[in-house]
UniProtKB/Swiss-Prot annotation:
NCBIfam families: L9. GO terms for cellular component: ribonucleoprotein complex; ribosome. This is Large ribosomal subunit protein bL9. It comes from the Bacteria. The lineage of its organism: Bacteria, Pseudomonadati, Pseudomonadota, Gammaproteobacteria, Vibrionales. One of its GO terms (molecular function) is structural constituent of ribosome.
Length: 149
């Protein structure tokens, strides 16, 4: 299925690219989230008419993400207290929602889908470097300290 991208999508393309994707991916993800439209003649003409407006919107989103990244990078260590055993093993785990809530409480608005935990949830106490993806091109890192209550 041919679609026109309205946003930069990793491993697919950037704004204005016409790409061929599987129909389920287009119908269930790209089109409902407003990241693409079907590549019909009418949509191609409409896109070309709105191209400058869409490019300005994408540039504005990128600028706001970069400003948020500076705030996240400026944070000192974010501390999360959790119940833990004698050897520093947590009762339960700390996931993306807990980290996003802690960063938001520290003063920078972050949602859980922006927090990246490649090794999965944190299950021990200690210091961790957490990556936050605020935009497809903008990453920030924050130091996270997990301490026992």
């Amino acid at each position: 299925m041919q679609v026109i991208l309205l946003d930069k999508i990793g491993n697919l393309g950037s704004l204005g690219d016409t790409v061929n994707v599987k129909s389920g991916y287009a119908r269930n993800f790209l089109i409902p989230q407003g990241k693409a439209v079907m590549a019909t003649k009418g949509n191609v003409e409409m896109f070309e008419a709105r191209r400058a407006e869409l490019e300005a919107k994408v540039a504005e989103q990128l600028a706001s993400a970069e400003a948020r990244a500076e705030k996240v990078n400026a944070l000192e260590a974010v501390v999360i207290a959790s119940k833990a055993g004698d050897e520093g093993k947590l009762f339960g785990s700390i996931g993306t929602r807990d980290i996003a809530d802690a960063i938001t409480a520290a003063g920078v608005e972050v949602v859980k889908s922006e927090v990246r935990l490649p090794e999965g949830a944190l299950r021990t106490t200690g210091e961790f470097e957490i990556s936050v993806q605020l935009h497809s091109e903008v990453f920030a890192t924050v130091k996270l300290q997990v301490v026992a209550e």
